[in-house]
From Swiss-Prot:
Xref: Pfam families: CASP_dom
Species name: Arabidopsis thaliana (Mouse-ear cress)
Annotated region (Disordered), positions in chain: 1-21
Family designation: Belongs to the Casparian strip membrane proteins (CASP) family.
InterPro entries: CASP/CASPL, CASP_dom, CASPL
Gene Ontology cellular component terms for the protein in this record: plasma membrane
Superkingdom of origin organism: Eukaryota
Main location: membrane
Transmembrane residue ranges: 29-49, 84-104, 112-132, 164-184
Protein's name in the database: CASP-like protein 1E2
Keyword Transmembrane helix among UniProt keywords: yes
Extracellular compartment residues: 50-83, 133-163
Stretches assigned to the Cytoplasmic side: 1-28, 105-111, 185-190
Compartments in which it is found: Cell membrane
Length: 190
């Protein structure tokens, strides 16, 4: 009689463990899909930001200003290109990691978990560095630099700045999601 009670208890504990494991996998999958969406959106938003405007430049005070058509694009700034590239890499990695984790549902080895953990750590570093680089250039465009006489770019290309700006918090959120994934990965390691 006592033996049956222990078996029932073990069965109930096993069922509870399976539910917790399943819910953890569900949280991980949800977070990876969120990271995929955030990185894709950040790369797209910054990649398509563009504005063309006619700018008047006065070369000599006695002559009339010269009107020049100028375009502001993310591809003209290496920090923005880096941020787009980092987001594209993170997006691709996330898609691959989702596929790998879906294929290896119940058969996740310690090696696979370690590879995913390291990949997630690399994505955290890349996304934070991309955010930092793009933020530095964005602030330079927003405020200029009086010491080297760089003018505010966002005063001239306001639409470009407003279109490019949302990519920074999206990238930052993606980095935070990857940080939580690193914590989840570390918890899963025995």
């Amino acid at each position: 009689m006592e033996h049956e009670g222990k078996n029932n208890m073990n069965g109930m504990e096993m069922e509870k463990g399976k539910r917790e494991l399943g819910s953890r996998k569900g949280v991980e999958l949800t977070m990876r899909v969120l990271a995929l969406i955030l990185t894709m959106a950040a790369a797209t938003v910054l990649g398509v930001a563009k504005q063309t405007k006619v700018v008047s430049i006065k070369l000599i005070p006695t002559l009339p200003p010269l009107d020049i058509t100028t375009t502001a694009k993310a591809s003209y700034l290496s920090a923005f290109v880096y941020n787009i590239s980092v987001n594209a890499i993170a997006c691709g990695y996330t898609a691959i990691s989702i596929a790998i984790l879906m294929i290896s549902r119940g058969r996740r080895s310690k090696k696979l978990l370690m590879v995913v953990l390291l990949g997630d750590l690399v994505m955290v570093a890349l996304l934070f560095s991309g955010t930092g680089a793009a933020s530095a250039i964005g602030l330079m465009g927003l405020h200029g630099n009086k010491h080297v006489m760089w003018k505010k770019v966002c005063g001239v290309f306001g639409k470009f700045c407003h279109r490019a700006a949302p990519s920074l918090p999206l990238t930052l959120l993606a980095a935070v999601v990857f940080m939580f994934l690193v914590v989840l990965d570390a918890i899963k390691l025995p």
